[in-house]
C-alpha cells in the first residue's frame, strides 16, 4: 500500500478563466511522490501528472499506488497529483467561500490551472506524461489536444473525449435536483438533494453483476453510506463541476494529439462503455493503443490498474 503522503499547499498569485474573470491568491492542494530529476538547466524532467476523477482530490493518486511503488511503472518518476480547480482543497466555490460568486469554469480552465501551478511552483512547462481518471481524463485529453508539445505520453483511464447520452443526463439531473430543492432556493445547504445526487452516482459506478450479487440490505446500506457522504458536499462545487463536465467535447481536436497514448477501458463500465467511448476514441487519436479488461467493479475497476503494470512499463519505455 502507498504510504499516506500529506498534502501540501501553494497559492497562484492570479488565475484568469476563459471567461476573462480572475481570482487572486488561488489555493492549490497537491501531493507528490517519487524524486525529481533535473536536466542540465536545473529543470525537473521526470514529472508525471495524475489527475483525479469527479469526486476525488489529490489523495486519489493512491488509486495508482501499484504504479508508483517499487517495481511500478512510475517508480522512477516524480508524480504530482493536484486537487483540480473546482474541487475542495484547491480554488473552488467552497474553499474560497465565494459560493455562487465563484467563476464558472471549463475543462480548459482546469487544465490551465494545473499548468500555471506547475510553472509557478516547480518551473515545469513540459511533463513526461499525464494520467487522468474519468473526469481527470477529460483534462488529460484536453491538455494533450490543446498543448500537444507539453507531454511525451498520455494515459486516459475509463474516460471519453465527450459527454453525451446518459452521462450528460446524469449531470443535468443532479443539478436540477439540487437547484430545485427548497432548501437550496432558501439559501441553506440542500442536504437531502445532495444525498440523493450522490446515491444516483453510486448506482452507476459499479457493474450490474456487482449490484446483483449484493443482498438488498447490503445495497440499501451502501446507498445510505454514499448519501451521507454526499450530504457533506458543497452544492456550488457540485453544480459548477457538473456544468464544466456537460460542456466537455473534443470532437475534431483529438487528431492534434502528438503524445504517445495508451487508453484503458473496462468492459463493464456503465459510465463509459468501451463501444461508445474508449474504442472510438482510440480510433480518433493518432497511433493510440487500447487495453480493455473485465471487472465486476465496473467504472471503479480502474483501481485494478496495477494488474497491467508490465504493459505500462513497456509503453513508457517505447517498446
From Swiss-Prot:
The active site is at residue 269. One of its GO terms (molecular function) is homoserine O-acetyltransferase activity. InterPro entries: AB_hydrolase_1, AB_hydrolase_fold, HAT_MetX-like. GO terms for biological process: homoserine metabolic process; methionine biosynthetic process. It comes from the Archaea. One of its GO terms (cellular component) is cytoplasm. This is Probable acyltransferase. It comes from Methanothermobacter thermautotrophicus (strain ATCC 29096 / DSM 1053 / JCM 10044 / NBRC 100330 / Delta H) (Methanobacterium thermoautotrophicum). The gene is metX.
